[in-house]
Amino acid sequence: MLRNISLKMDYTKTREIDDYLKHVLKPQRYIHSLGVVEMAGDLASIYGSDVKKARFAGLVHDIAKCFSCETMNRLIRTYGIDLKYYNRPELAHSKVGAAMLKKDFGIDDPEILMAVSSHTAGRYGMSMLEEIVYVA
């Protein structure tokens, strides 16, 4: 069972994004994201990483998971994402999610954006935050 998760973070968009996630994600996906918030925070605490940043990245990591393949393909073109993700929503959602956070929600922290972008397939040379979200 999840502990009481406080979403009081130092990011002004957190409440707006949390409300958005509650409306667009299926309930089980939203619950999954809250679990990632908790696990990412715990791992960040253990490994000396920024707990608030890890929790925020955990919350938003699946922000684009709700889109159909057709919508994902449109967003890939809109955001200028590599076309190798076209018709591959299971991989594209991380790239689209990072682009959404930056362009639609004004999140400009490169560590958070990279953690979201790489959480599905990983990448060589991931930062501690990327590894935390990937594992969480």
Predicted regions, residues:
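Generic N-terminal amphipathic, Lys/Arg-enriched alpha-helix
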Residues: 2-5, 9-26
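Divalent metal-dependent catalytic cores for phosphoryl transfer on phosphate-bearing substrates
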Residues: 16-24, 41-136
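All-alpha helical catalytic cores of prenyl diphosphate-utilizing isoprenoid enzymes
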Residues: 29
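N-terminal glycine-rich anion-binding loops that anchor highly charged ligand groups
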Residues: 32-33
